[in-house]
Amino acid sequence: MSKFKQLYKPLLDNAQWETPLSLAIEGTAFGHWLLEPNSLSRRLQRHCDEFTVSLIEQKKIDSTMLSADERELIGDVDCLLRKVVLMGDGQPWVFARTLIPLSTLTGQESDLEQLGEMPLGFRVFTDRSARRDALEVANTGTQAQPLWARRSRLWINNKPLLVAELFLAQAPVYSKEKQC
């Protein structure tokens, strides 16, 4: 799984994030995926017989490891960094990188540190207070093979976390016959 980190982490790190409006993705098949307001994991689960999460890395990082725009979105704070691959029927569909401020990991949200291979979306979107904002998208691939990504800030009990998701080539976002 370290190959995912080597191959796809730079794509997220170097993504040119833009607002969905600036890329005119609304109304497109892939736009429906990128603009999904609820749990991406639940949506992906509907497209396969077996949905799994492979935990690549989880560690605490210092605020100096955050980019300037990440600090702007969640603050100049130390975080728990979580990297996973979401898989459908054994195929890698999404590489995801989550930054959870340590201050978010208090009270009811302390369990976020113990998710392991459980999808983050399954936990976050069961909470009635969950919401998403600051949604940005990027095309990190080529014209011949686009690799779309999205980044958004999630809130749970008014505590932030930042999720960046890269839709890999085999993801249903690119499949015309599996749109829903």
UniProtKB/Swiss-Prot annotation:
Gene behind the chain: ubiC
EC number: 4.1.3.40
Catalytic activity, as annotated: chorismate = 4-hydroxybenzoate + pyruvate
The organism of origin for this protein: Photobacterium profundum (strain SS9)
Molecular function as annotated in GO: chorismate lyase activity
Protein known as: Probable chorismate pyruvate-lyase
Protein role: Removes the pyruvyl group from chorismate, with concomitant aromatization of the ring, to provide 4-hydroxybenzoate (4HB) for the ubiquinone pathway.
UniProt keyword terms in alphabetical order: Cytoplasm, Lyase, Pyruvate, Ubiquinone biosynthesis
Swiss-Prot/TrEMBL GO biological process terms: pyruvate biosynthetic process; ubiquinone biosynthetic process
Keyword Cytoplasm among UniProt keywords: yes
Family: Belongs to the UbiC family.
Record's GO cellular component terms: cytosol
